Amino acid sequence: MVVLKVCLVLLFLVGGTTSANLRLSKLGLLMKSDHQHSNDDESSKPCCDQCACTKSNPPQCRCSDMRLNSCHSACKSCICALSYPAQCFCVDITDFCYEPCKPSEDDKEN
């Protein structure tokens, strides 16, 4: 039992001194700051299907799309639930909405 406690303490000490930009919040969420993507596939392109903006000038917009395992490539502050697969959303506030990820019904008909 003592060995287990010592191992856990060492794990926290080593984990706390690394320079990774990850934080565990009180809500069981993993916060990634300035995360980097190793691939530039379709899912990492900045886009948003569920964007809401305030009526202020300039507007303050936030995307509420949920993505698996990471946020889009332009996201500066990504929060991921500690689940498998991780469900992530970007908490950045911008003054615009990104292009939609999915084509609208009108686009499909043309």
UniProtKB/Swiss-Prot annotation:
Residues spanning the signal sequence: 1-19
Site residues (Reactive bond for chymotrypsin), renumbered to this chain: 82-83
InterPro entries: Bowman-Birk_prot_inh, Prot_inh_BBI
Disulfide bridge positions per record: 47-101, 48-63, 51-97, 53-61, 71-78, 75-90, 80-88
Propeptide part(s) removed at maturation, as residue ranges: 20-39
Molecular function, one GO term: serine-type endopeptidase inhibitor activity
Keyword Transmembrane listed: no
Family of this protein: Belongs to the Bowman-Birk serine protease inhibitor family.
Role noted for this protein: Inhibitor of trypsin and of chymotrypsin.
The protein, known as: Bowman-Birk type proteinase inhibitor
